[in-house]
Amino acid sequence: MTKRLLILEDGTIFEGEPFGADIDVTGEIVFNTGMTGYQESITDQSYNGQILTFTYPLIGNYGINRDDYESISPTCKGVVVSEVSRLASNWRKQMTLDAFLKIKGIPGISGIDTRALTKIIRQHGTMKATMADDGDSIQHLKDQLRATVLPTNTIEQVSTKTAYPAPGIGKNIVLVDFGLKHSILREFSKRQCNITVVPFNITAEEVFQLNPDGLMLSNGPGNPEDLPEALDMIRGVQGKIPIFGICMGHQLFSLANGAKTCKMTFGHRGFNHAVREIATGRIDFTSQNHGYAVERSSLPDTLMVTHEDINDKTVEGVKHRDFPAFSVQFHPDAAPGPHDASYLFDEFLEMIDSWRCTSK
């Protein structure tokens, strides 16, 4: 059987068995520490352009089902596992992980020492990597990898091109799609909200034409500093209607208010990250997927930190002192992961009710 190579930007080479699509790819290599939820992770648009390493030793044993998609068209570049299950056993499964990746054009590699790979990423940071068959010249692949410039328009690639509705009978929410997870829509649907999903480059004027009760800023991939138009939109909306941001939305909300963001060494990607709510001391276990973070020292007086990571004190949530607006770095929608923080959707809707009363 043909072997598949994983070549890192620092020159490290791993050899493994191929599965999924039979193509060569290059992307940023990252790791996810979740024990389950590989379908949600692979279909999460926040992994756009990235080669996704799973640290859990066996991936694929329950297959792929129709209910756990976070997007219909996944855009991660590749999947790296220690061992892939070629058979799937679950009453909901429709196909194996191998078959799914073949259909979606995503290559995979198994038989990799993912512990060693993760250690490299932790020590040296995320980096470019190439996944290719071993019939190719290794030196040629290394030269190509060094010369590759990864794209920066990742959100433009995954955001909806046109607005569309997710009807409900409750509050009107405009949801800006920076790489939207379907689980966010499901959380609002549970609460009967009337949602309009809009492209990433919508203007403040276009937002108000939709007569919203609140603005939701979704998750998404890439560097938040690449979206100056989104910052202008947020500044034009805040103070007029409540705002809630998640992940990329959190970073954009912070930038729009004068804070700075920085690229993390290896990021937070997994479903077991403990976060402290500063006001109450409450500890929530959260789902996270981000390679950038808000710099605490850069926060203006108008923003207060509401949540922080237990382990490294990363800013995990902020709230505006003057306007009805807040954001969190983690995913309260979970999917996959714990639902400890799903109450934040209720707090957003309660904020809308309070704002209606005070603004009359």
Curated annotation (Swiss-Prot):
This is Carbamoyl phosphate synthase small chain. CDD domains: GATase1_CPSase. GO terms for biological process: 'de novo' pyrimidine nucleobase biosynthetic process; 'de novo' UMP biosynthetic process; glutamine metabolic process; L-arginine biosynthetic process. Pathway: Amino-acid biosynthesis; L-arginine biosynthesis; carbamoyl phosphate from bicarbonate: step 1/1; Pyrimidine metabolism; UMP biosynthesis via de novo pathway; (S)-dihydroorotate from bicarbonate: step 1/3. Keywords: Amino-acid biosynthesis, Arginine biosynthesis, ATP-binding, Glutamine amidotransferase, Ligase, Nucleotide-binding, Pyrimidine biosynthesis. Residues 1-169 are annotated as: CPSase. It comes from the Bacteria. GO terms for molecular function: ATP binding; carbamoyl-phosphate synthase (glutamine-hydrolyzing) activity; glutaminase activity.
